[in-house]
Amino acid sequence: MQKLWGKVSIGTLWYLSGGFGKSNGADFSNVRITRGYLTLKFKPVPWFQPRVTLDTSQDSSGDWKVRLKYMHAKFVLPVETAWVTEPNVEFGLVHGPWFDYEENINRYRMQGTMFVERNGVINSADTGVTVAMLLGKKLPKAYQQSVSNEYPGEFGSIAFGVYNGGGYHAAENNTNKVFESRVSVRPLGPILPNLQLSYLLIYGKGNTPAQVCDDTGANCYPGEPAWRLNAGMASFEDEYFVATAQVAKGRGNQSGSKIDAAGAALTSEGYSGFAEVRLPWIDSSLVGRYDHWNWAGTGTDRVIAGFAYRFLGEGNVVLLDYDRSMPDGGTDSWEAKLTVQVKVP
């Protein structure tokens, strides 16, 4: 038993923030915990790597609750070839194909959710199965140490899977299964590994029953609205600079809430840009992001700017940022806040 415990690793990830601002015309100020993860990983052998992550969050009444974020068995084929490296399968409550990839390029999930999640399309985990692998051999250690050791395939990486479709916030409300896939390529391979081009596809239905009725049962409309997304991202990572540009177009969303009066899925489209200027000589970064998203002709623009300081390694960060949301025909909302990310190990 003691020998097995030596193969268990424990990690934490916390986002602790305090800020003030204006939301829908009303002033606010608060201190809050936006993420509280406790993760246990078990690696008894290289080919079997199960994981469980508990997520502590605060509900609308202010009560603190613990829920599962991930709980899966992961099977890895520990090989490195000229074609694929470390193909693996996650089964259970698993990573989706996209967000773990994007959040290892834009390292500021502590500020808030990523582009398509921020606009209500999808969240980051679901119950199902994910297949993933690196394309080609791994990039040289020098690149991994100076730029990034995440998804280090010489020619990119792929991930795809089939999921219940409710995410990790909700039970499955229909029998539909959702297909999601990501393809990321380094078009110049190891010649210019900094550049990646990625494509995300989502094909399924929103997480509602086949028929949705009001409380009286008299007014009903068809459920299971279409949920489609096509998104592309170009990214460039360097020791001193990171930039991404995204475009997306689709219909509907994961929860099935983005619909018209007849229950049909709303169309959507948007674009986003992110940049980080790294200042390693003072363990700091300047970050900026711009989002535009449009649901059926109603758009929202968002601007984010911040300064980050890293201490005791790359995982512990203090971020001071300003976030402003500007909806068409509505009242701007904004927040200035300080966030501390604590990551162990």
Tell where the protein language model's regions lie, with residue ranges.
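Well-ordered beta-strand positions
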Residues: K41, S235, A308-R310
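Outer membrane beta-barrel
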Residues: M1-G165, N173-E180, S184-I191, Y271-R278, ...
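Outer-membrane beta-barrel "beta-signal"
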Residues: D332-P345
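Flexible, glycine-rich linker and terminal segments associated
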Residues: S285, N316, V342-P345
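A short, acidic, flexible beta-alpha connecting loop/helix-capping segment that sits on the rim
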Residues: Y322-D328
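C-terminal closing repeat unit and adjoining cap/tail of repeat-based domains
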Residues: G306-D321
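Outer-membrane beta-barrel translocator domains and adjoining extracellular loop/strand segments
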Residues: G21-D27, S61-L68, E102-R107, Y143-S146, ...
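Detector for outer-membrane/organellar transmembrane beta-barrel domains
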Residues: M1-G11, N176, S184-A296, D301
